[in-house]
Regions:
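Flexible helix-coil linker/hinge segments at domain or subdomain boundaries
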Residues: 43, 74-88, 160-178
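Aromatic/basic-lined ligand-recognition segments
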Residues: 11, 62-140
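Long, repeat-rich segments with strong aromatic
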Residues: 129-134, 138-167
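Short, small-residue-biased leader/transition segments that mark boundaries at the very start
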Residues: 2-5
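The substrate-binding groove and active-site-proximal loops of carbohydrate-active enzymes
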Residues: 13-22
Length: 178
């Protein structure tokens, strides 16, 4: 994410080390507090990119994760700013145009990476080759700990769910609460 100092002339990208569990969330909360107390501002081009460990994913988990995110994308878009919705953002492309059958027929991560060849997708599979992570790029830049924590928890639950199943097409937010 690009963030600006209070005079809006000094921009920088903030990259955290690997954060895990409650300890990681506590560290993140402290960083967000420091950024806020320094009057750091986020510009409109910012994105929050979250890498989640994918080292132990099997092909079923990968397929389920992509299908679930794709099927829930329209609902996820509803809690994102307009600049991060649909396929209009160059840096976080939509998954909607990719046929379910192509995702289901992939035999390994390389085939899925071939189907989603750009890293500039809401779900970036290219990160796996280098970092052994799946990168989620849809969220807008923020220094709000609450927003980041909620997004990370949502993604964690989606990954947990993907290890056992996938969401059907046409899912609604109300359905996700059940």
């Amino acid at each position: 994410s690009d963030v600006c100092s209070s005079d809006l002339n000094d921009t920088f990208e903030l990259v955290s080390p690997i954060l895990e569990g409650e300890d990681g969330l506590e560290k993140l909360e402290r960083v967000c507090w420091v950024l806020d107390s320094c009057n750091v501002k986020i510009n409109g081009s910012c994105g929050l990119h979250v890498h989640m460990n994918a080292e132990d994913f099997n092909i079923t988990t990968w397929r389920n994760l992509l299908l679930s995110y794709k099927h829930a994308e329209a609902e996820i878009d509803k809690f994102m700013p307009a600049s991060r919705r649909g396929g209009s953002n160059t840096y976080c492309g939509s998954l909607i145009q990719f046929p379910d059958e192509r995702i289901r027929s992939a035999r390994n991560i390389r085939e899925l990476q071939g189907l989603f060849p750009s890293r500039y997708m809401k779900v970036n599979l290219q990160a796996y080759s280098r970092h052994r992570t799946v990168e989620f790029r849809q969220h807008s830049g923020t220094i709000s700990f609450t927003k980041i924590e909620n997004w990370v928890c949502f993604l964690d639950r989606m990954i947990t769910f993907a290890s056992v199943g996938s969401l059907p097409a046409g899912i609604r937010l109300e359905d996700l609460d059940r």
